[in-house]
Regions:
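Active-site-adjacent mobile loop/cap segments within catalytic or ligand-binding domains
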Residues: 30, 41, 72, 100, ...
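Bacterial Sec-dependent signal peptides at the C-terminal "C-region" and cleavage site
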Residues: 4-8, 12-26
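Short secondary-structure junctions
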Residues: 141-147
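Catalytic-core regions of hydrolytic enzymes
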Residues: 23-133, 141
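Short alpha-helical functional segments enriched in proximate histidine and acidic residues
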Residues: 63, 138, 198, 202
């Protein structure tokens, strides 16, 4: 009887361990820091899009402490990458999701807020739309800027990525309030933590 009990206990323990192991899921994410090098992106006064996005990218990478979340980045330095080079990088890794970071600008300085984009031209359009909506919800909850919601656009990096991909336009540097937030350490940290919270929720 004792031996039978030991066998039963071993079977239960193995089944429990197998369940826990099955539940663990490693995910791969590409964070694409837009522009770089001679490509400044949007500019306003001293604010440069290429610099803001790379700072947020590095913060996402450094804040991640989950061994099951692999963060791959297109750049952490100020150098130029063509759209084709970015797409090649993404399609070689084949991540679960691409999040491309950008900032916006408008001639009307009162235009403000964060926009999340996906492309219906992508082979992963449905999943991209789903991811864009989920990310936008987390952004609306955590970031104290106007949330302009999810939009559809045939941006090259979204259309040419063979995996789900979204663009986050993190705010308008042509708007003083948005610019102050985006160029501030606290604001950049909040955005990085928000994106990481969303990524953690994908597990």
């Amino acid at each position: 009887m004792k031996n039978l009990f030991k066998v039963a206990l071993l079977v239960v323990s193995f089944a429990t361990l197998s369940f826990i192991t099955a539940e663990k899921k490693e995910i791969n994410i590409v964070i694409d820091a837009g522009h770089g090098g001679h490509d400044l992106g949007a500019t306003h006064e001293e604010a440069l899009e290429k610099s803001i996005v790379v700072e947020v990218t590095k913060k996402i990478q450094s804040l991640n402490t989950d061994a099951d979340i692999k963060i791959h980045v297109t750049r952490t330095e100020d150098h130029f990458l063509s759209l084709q080079e970015r797409a090649n990088f993404i399609n070689k890794i084949k991540p679960d999701l691409v999040i491309s970071l950008h900032t916006n600008s408008n001639k009307n300085s009162t235009t403000t807020g964060i926009e999340t984009f996906y492309s219906d031209k992508s082979i992963a359009a449905l999943k991209s739309e789903e991811m864009a909506n989920k990310l936008s919800e987390v952004i609306a909850k955590n970031i104290p800027l106007n949330n302009r919601g999810v939009k559809k656009a045939p941006f090259w990096i979204l259309s040419k990525s063979e995996v789900p991909a979204v663009i986050v336009e993190m705010g308008f540097i042509s708007n003083q309030n948005d610019k102050d937030y985006l160029t501030n350490e606290k604001g950049q940290n909040e955005i990085a933590k928000t994106i990481l919270e969303f990524i953690e929720g994908l597990k």
